[in-house]
């Protein structure tokens, strides 16, 4: 008689993905529970880049707080400043001059392209294509130069101000941006030629990480994550801010809500942003005037005026030491950032500093759904799904 082999309990295999994994987008640590090659549970560990931004902001004036927003989603910095400035303008009831609005739109769209170039090409890198990131970074470098020529900094721009933007754009810069925008669709074609119909890229992304319309809404997704599932929700259209109503652009939608559709949406969004950039350059040629509000409560006096008038000098000094006071109240402002709806909820107690500032990072709910999206997928699909979520840790950990 053959002795019965004692049953050994099957132990699930646990594996750490990150924080120093090349596909883990920064400092993400995922604890994966595997059954063979199949993912059963994903446990994201966040907080490794937590800097206490929201708490720090309570001890700074409104103007001193703007640079903190560059450090959230550091791939497209100006889009975050935008939301904070809109919130302050809502509190104060300040109007932005039309030229200032156009410049804001122009640089928000440049930020969108910066973000999508990085995401689309690194998504390809996560599944094994090593050429696209090199091409993407070449274009990002040109856009970084436009950032630098507008405000002097390549990354942490600190360019938007309550009431407009810090300084006007020289005409040569507008021409150079327009020239770049004319040539950019060709670059998009090159990148698409490399990966859109690539057999391996499709096998790794089609029908992976599918999100239905209902699920996207109940998880609190925004941006490409809902548009990839076929929901036409874009704040630039549905709740227009600045002068987006004056621009003609389409909102690309996916059908299947998988990683591949989200990739296609981002590719098409870059083309739409290029259209907006061309229109903005055309508008800037025709529209002249101030780029910062004339309201002296929030905007500093002109440099020439300060050289003549003592009052203007005092005014400037007070504005930059004490800052301006906002009326007490609560306000929420949001923009369509490249990753989704970036919102800022400011509670003001009538002083020169915010009483509380809550930042709604679009990547946070996306990462929260990581566990649900990966269940039943292969281990190799984790990096493909993570790549299509478009996660940057600056804004998730804040």
From Swiss-Prot:
- Protein name, as recorded: NADH-quinone oxidoreductase subunit D
What EC number(s) does its UniProt record assign? 7.1.1.-
Classification via InterPro entries: NADH_Q_OxRdtase_suD, NADH_UbQ_OxRdtase_49kDa_CS, NDH1_su_D/H, NiFe-Hase_large
What is this protein for, i.e. what is its function?
NDH-1 shuttles electrons from NADH, via FMN and iron-sulfur (Fe-S) centers, to quinones in the respiratory chain. The immediate electron acceptor for the enzyme in this species is believed to be ubiquinone. Couples the redox reaction to proton translocation (for every two electrons transferred, four hydrogen ions are translocated across the cytoplasmic membrane), and thus conserves the redox energy in a proton gradient.
Signal peptide location in the record? Answer: none
Q: Which SUPFAM superfamilies match?
A: HydB/Nqo4-like
Q: Where in the cell is it found?
A: Cell inner membrane
Organism of provenance: Caulobacter vibrioides (strain ATCC 19089 / CIP 103742 / CB 15) (Caulobacter crescentus)
Q: Which family does it belong to?
A: Belongs to the complex I 49 kDa subunit family.
Entry's Gene Ontology molecular function annotations: NAD binding; NADH:ubiquinone reductase (non-electrogenic) activity; quinone binding
Q: Which reaction does it catalyse?
A: a quinone + NADH + 5 H(+)(in) = a quinol + NAD(+) + 4 H(+)(out)
Coiled-coil zones: none
A single GO cellular-component term from the record reads: plasma membrane
Determine the domain of life of the protein's source.
Bacteria
Subunit details: NDH-1 is composed of 14 different subunits. Subunits NuoB, C, D, E, F, and G constitute the peripheral sector of the complex.
Keywords for this entry?
Cell inner membrane, Cell membrane, Membrane, NAD, Quinone, Translocase, Transport, Ubiquinone
According to its UniProt record, this protein's enzyme class is translocase
Is Cell membrane among this UniProt entry's keywords? yes
